[in-house]
């Protein structure tokens, strides 16, 4: 009954949130820690009322890019993958503030039929074009999606693609220096961003159609005629170094844990290096390195121009022709290799903190195109939906025990889209993915108990406690409404269409909505057992006294649950059924295979 009520409440919250947006009220601010890993605070932003069919995220609060490996061929064919895709949205110009969106009725709507999305056509100049049908909205959305990213970084130059993209966006053009560029954007109330990920770099432009003709020359110059000013290079390189040294290491324990997990999962793989760059690599880069990288990876044959909203009929062809002035061809792209981690199972990052951030996961090849994706979506939601209470992790770790603020699971790389939206960013499509669990920070005395509790829930979900008919039915009802929020805006519809093109498929969201209704409980459990292997989960913890934690892990020392106490030092009584489970959890074997399987690293060494 509790699960049904929790699911109903979650679905009601989704509906209420959509209705609140429909009548034009501003959304509540999201908790900062839920925003995607490296958020770019440097971009300037001003309010813009969006007619994009939904609330647009603030450019200044959008997340950043990604870096990672040796030359283009080697990068995509090389070793293993993982990564710090966390950081990747550099922003310039104005951010949207949000306006009305259409309402949503949860389960009352029939499932959306799978609809064929537009396909990419190659123009004479080699540039791809993907245009959603023109509508009567006042906002025009443009995306320049390059099949280039952190995997294209040469060895010893982690962060080069990200820095090149930031130089293009924020370093000025031949016609406008950086200050003049900002001044030109301000009165247009436009968004101009870039997001760098492992395999993709996306320049995003969004503007009212009345200002489109003023924005287009700026966008063209940003991509075709960067200024490459040595002073701007020095400034932006220093920003990137500070982002790693100060923001990530010192001020963002949760995303430090996530980034560290991705580097662990993709040991010796092009995904395994921080997209933002490693400090020593960044400091070694020259402006000549950046210019050469831009010419090598931002080429016409790797570009798809995406359009959505109320754009002029000839805009796509005009942009494709303009951007055919890019270098025509780059080195052929090789396939991204499968990820096979060779690192320790436990990475313990030593840092003086009041609580411990925990992330755990394993790499796999599950993608949107896989026949199991709908079943895995249901299982993942039932196990730990992002920022919702209808999953086992939230009910049993937070609700029953009060361990922390939230506990979530993901079946693909996830970075939140910003604002109060709990949806994932688009533009993060990859040939390799990962399963991960994110435990929000816990009290240091409870960190090993929390880890054991999460691992026990995962083990039981694939063996002793399969998802029930009730859980699957309730989760389907929740997703029936929740998935309607995923593509409410033109910008998100365009993002998904471009992601579909990456995977070689059409209509992912519509197909997923339809398939959710067809999957049986048996199929959900079979897919979950097929893909999830608790023994392969690797663990990152960020907190103090990690040498002692290592000893406890290797010795198998029990870690009892410490419940919160009142002012008199008394803990509220707990049901015997719960404390009996606690007794089992505290002694759960963690599976360390010896000293080399547990690595302790000072925070100053991470991404150095």
Q: What is the predicted role of each segment?
A:
Residues 14-16:
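C-terminal motif of bacterial Sec signal peptides marking the signal peptidase cleavage site
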């Amino acid at each position: 009954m509790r699960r049904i009520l929790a699911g109903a409440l979650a679905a009601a919250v989704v509906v209420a949130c959509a209705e609140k947006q429909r009548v034009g009220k501003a959304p509540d601010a999201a908790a900062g820690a839920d925003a995607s890993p490296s958020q770019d605070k440097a971009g300037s932003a001003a309010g813009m009322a969006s007619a994009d069919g939904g609330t647009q995220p603030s450019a200044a609060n959008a997340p950043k890019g990604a870096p990672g490996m040796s030359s283009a061929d080697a990068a995509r064919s090389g070793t293993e993958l993982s990564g710090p895709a966390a950081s990747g949205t550099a922003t310039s110009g104005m951010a949207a503030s949000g306006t009305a969106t259409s309402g949503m009725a949860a389960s009352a709507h029939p499932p959306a039929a799978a609809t064929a999305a537009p396909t990419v056509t190659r123009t004479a100049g080699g540039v791809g074009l993907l245009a959603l049908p023109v509508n009567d909205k006042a906002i025009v959305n443009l995306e320049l999606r390059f099949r280039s990213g952190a995997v294209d970084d040469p060895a010893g130059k982690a962060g080069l693609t990200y820095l090149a993209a930031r130089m293009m966006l924020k370093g000025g053009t031949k016609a406008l220096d950086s200050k003049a560029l900002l001044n030109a954007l301000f009165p247009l109330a436009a968004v101009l961003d870039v997001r760098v990920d492992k395999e993709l770099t996306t320049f995003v432009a969004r503007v009212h159609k009345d200002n489109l003709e003023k924005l287009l020359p700026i966008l063209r110059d940003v991509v075709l005629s960067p200024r490459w000013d040595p002073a701007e290079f020095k400034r932006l390189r220093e920003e990137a170094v500070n982002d790693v040294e100060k923001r990530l290491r010192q001020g963002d324990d949760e995303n430090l844990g996530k980034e560290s997990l991705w580097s662990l999962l993709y040991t010796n793989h092009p995904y395994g290096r921080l997209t933002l760059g490693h400090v020593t690599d960044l400091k070694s880069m020259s402006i000549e390195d950046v210019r050469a990288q831009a010419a090598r990876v931002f080429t016409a044959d790797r570009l798809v121009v995406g359009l959505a909203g109320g754009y002029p009929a000839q805009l796509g062809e005009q942009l494709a022709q303009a951007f055919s002035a890019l270098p025509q061809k780059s080195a052929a792209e090789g396939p991204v290799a499968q990820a096979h981690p060779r690192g320790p199972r436990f990475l313990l990052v030593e840092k003086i903190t009041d609580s411990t951030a925990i992330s755990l996961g394993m790499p796999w090849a599950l993608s949107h195109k896989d026949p199991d994706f709908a079943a895995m979506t249901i299982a993942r939601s039932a196990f730990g939906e992002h920022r919702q209470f209808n999953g086992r992790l939230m009910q049993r770790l937070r609700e029953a025990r009060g361990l922390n603020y939230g506990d979530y699971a993901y079946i693909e790389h996830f970075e939140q889209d910003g604002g109060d939206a709990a949806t994932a960013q688009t533009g993060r499509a990859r040939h390799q993915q990962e399963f991960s669990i994110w435990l929000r920070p816990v009290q240091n005395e409870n960190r090993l108990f929390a880890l054991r509790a999460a691992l026990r829930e995962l083990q039981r979900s694939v063996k002793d406690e399969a998802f029930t008919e009730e859980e699957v039915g309730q989760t389907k009802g929740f997703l029936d409404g929740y998935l309607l929020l995923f593509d409410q805006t033109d910008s998100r519809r365009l993002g998904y269409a471009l992601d579909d093109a990456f995977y070689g498929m059409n209509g992912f969201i519509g197909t997923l909505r339809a398939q959710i209704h067809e999957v049986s409980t048996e199929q959900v459990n079979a897919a979950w057992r097929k893909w999830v292997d608790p023994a392969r989960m690797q663990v990152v913890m960020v907190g103090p006294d990690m040498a002692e934690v290592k000893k406890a892990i290797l010795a198998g020392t029990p870690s009892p649950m410490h419940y919160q106490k009142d002012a008199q030092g008394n803990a509220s009584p707990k049901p015997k059924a719960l404390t009996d489970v606690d007794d089992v959890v505290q002694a759960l074997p963690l599976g360390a295979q010896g000293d080399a399987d547990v690595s302790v690293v000072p925070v100053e060494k991470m991404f150095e």
